[in-house]
């Protein structure tokens, strides 16, 4: 499985509870439709935008880190496109985190092998 990061920005004029439901809906979509394993959900809340987005100067930011095969990522894109509450979204493959994870796994494996040799 590959590691991905998705950031999405929700309109600020929606009630806080509703924005929370929308963010949780994205997480549920990832789990159900993409069979993704969620590593972390980071809700930033309302922040100023770098420039106006559809006449909004601030928006609600959320970042989700997840693991998936990547086969159905276009479904995630469509999920965001058809819902007007999203101002922007972007999904990245996090190759740096994948490499870091592999490197850590190799170190653990090496330590285990060294311990077996010493016994």
Swiss-Prot record:
The cross-references to InterPro entries, in alphabetical order and at most eight, read: Ribosomal_bS6 (IPR000529), Ribosomal_bS6_sf (IPR035980), Ribosomal_S6_plastid/chlpt (IPR020814), Transl_elong_EF1B/ribsomal_bS6 (IPR014717)
Q: Does this entry carry the keyword Ribonucleoprotein?
A: yes
Give the CDD domains listed for this entry. Answer: bS6
GO-annotated molecular function: small ribosomal subunit rRNA binding; structural constituent of ribosome
List, alphabetically, the Pfam families matched.
Ribosomal_S6 (PF01250)
Spell out the SUPFAM superfamilies in the cross-references. Ribosomal protein S6
Choose one Gene Ontology CC annotation of this protein and give it.
Answer: cytoplasm
- List this protein's GO terms for biological process: translation
Instruction: Identify the keywords attached in UniProt to this record, alphabetized.
Output: Ribonucleoprotein, Ribosomal protein, RNA-binding, rRNA-binding
Q: What protein does this entry describe?
A: Small ribosomal subunit protein bS6
Q: Provide the species name.
A: Thermosipho africanus (strain TCF52B)
């Amino acid at each position: 499985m590959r590691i991905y990061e998705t950031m999405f920005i929700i309109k600020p004029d929606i009630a806080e509870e509703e924005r929370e439901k929308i963010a949780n809906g994205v997480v549920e979509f990832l789990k159900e439709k993409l069979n993704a394993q969620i590593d972390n959900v980071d809700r930033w809340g309302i922040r100023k935008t770098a420039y106006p987005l559809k006449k909004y100067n601030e928006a609600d930011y959320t970042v989700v880190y997840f693991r998936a095969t990547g086969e159905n990522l276009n479904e995630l894109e469509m999920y965001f496109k058809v819902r007007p509450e999203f101002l922007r979204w972007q999904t990245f493959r996090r190759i740096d985190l994948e490499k870091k994870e592999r490197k850590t796994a190799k170190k653990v494996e090496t330590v285990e092998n060294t311990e077996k040799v010493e016994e």
